[in-house]
Curated annotation (Swiss-Prot):
This is NADH-quinone oxidoreductase subunit B. The keyword Lyase does not apply. SUPFAM superfamilies: HydA/Nqo6-like. NDH-1 is composed of 14 different subunits. Subunits NuoB, C, D, E, F, and G constitute the peripheral sector of the complex. Transmembrane segments: none annotated. Coiled coil: none annotated. GO terms for cellular component: plasma membrane; respiratory chain complex I. GO terms for biological process: aerobic respiration; electron transport coupled proton transport.
Amino acid sequence: MGLEEQLPGGILLSTVEKVAGYVRKNSLWPATFGLACCAIEMMATAGPRFDIARFGMERFSATPRQADLMIVAGRVSQKMAPVLRQIYDQMAEPKWVLAMGVCASSGGMFNNYAIVQGVDHVVPVDIYLPGCPPRPEMLLYAILKLHEKIQQMPLGVNRETAIAEAEQAALSARPTIEMRGLLR
């Protein structure tokens, strides 16, 4: 006979990490960082038809200090990359990044010197969302996948080392193809 059978009804056993993960995943405040056409689909997700508020995202934060999720929606130019990194550094811990669309994930069809070939060269990305532009349903699905990832995130020192390792691996990763001018 285990401990669960001896407890009266209405008592739940859990760890602090699981409770914190549950609370954290249901109270995300995304930062508005729409850069191109994917931002239109991100705005549609906040509308009444798709209602992102049912997942705890009541409002999009205009300041990075009050946001913990950055949705990079669209292509990132070389001039915008330092601004993106500065906004990421100003966000409160814990923070997550969602790359929305092919342009944010890999540069998309814009294979030239002015566009960053994937936002993961600037900030560590937690979820990649494909599509050009991805539909609001896909953004909601990616947010649910991010909720699962947040639920499993450790706390304290374990969390800091996990984040540092993930960021270092993401920023030091080599591109999958070698770029030679505008032609491959």
